Design a protein with these regions (language model features):
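DNA breakage-rejoining catalytic core of tyrosine-based enzymes
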Residues: 1-19, 73-82, 98-101
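Active-site/catalytic core of tyrosine-dependent DNA strand-transfer enzymes
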Residues: 15-18, 83-134
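Short basic/aromatic active-site micro-motif
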Residues: 134-154
């Protein structure tokens, strides 16, 4: 959590660090947080939307689900990556879930109450320290940014990737998407590299 009237931006994790974190959390029997981090980096949804996910959505036979985004009220269809599907099923089995309509990220504090965003941010900061993650500002937003950065870096056509991400993130321009992913700052800093002495 940031101080009132201050501005702190979250950073993205390197993809290998993010997927390794998901595996380590699972290995350490922290199944729900492993699943939460995994869903964040594989779906690119805002945390408010991740917290709406039910087991029925994640275990869908056609490996996709539709969600109405809380912030924009827009419907978004999400396809579940084949490799990530196995992790979802493993978490489902390990947690011994009995009700498919149950939210995936129940806090245990009251019936049908999901984790709070503040609590998740505290947990992420603890994970940063515990697993020695190389990231300055680690928050729920970092998961979405990690997704975006991976999509951008994996694409052979950077401009097309930015247009796709702009639509997925519901940004009004590619410029906003570039700034969101920290690409604009990198471009500006790279300006200094073109100088010679």
């Amino acid at each position: 959590m940031s101080l009132k009237n201050s501005y702190t931006t979250s950073d993205c994790l390197q993809w290998d660090s993010a997927t390794n974190l998901v595996r380590k959390l699972y290995r350490d029997k922290n199944y729900r947080i492993s699943l939460l981090v995994g869903c964040g980096i594989f779906f690119g949804l805002r945390i408010s939307d991740l917290l709406q996910l039910t087991w029925e959505m994640l275990l869908s036979k056609d490996a996709k689900f539709t969600i109405t985004e809380k912030k924009t009220s827009k419907r978004r269809e999400v396809r579940i990556n084949k490799e990530f599907q196995k992790h979802i099923k493993d978490c489902y089995t390990a947690l011994d879930i009995q009700n498919l309509n149950e939210f995936c990220f129940l806090s245990g504090k009251g019936r049908n109450k999901v984790y709070s965003i503040q609590w998740i941010n505290i947990v992420l900061k603890e994970l940063k320290s515990k697993y020695n993650l190389k990231i300055d500002h680690f928050s729920t937003h970092s998961l979405r940014k990690t997704f975006g950065r991976k999509v951008f870096e994996s694409s052979e056509n950077a401009e097309l990737a930015l247009v796709k991400l702009m639509e997925l993130f519901n940004h009004s321009s590619v410029t906003i998407t570039k700034r969101y992913l920290g690409l604009r700052q990198e471009e500006l800093l790279n300006t200094y590299d073109c100088l010679s002495f």
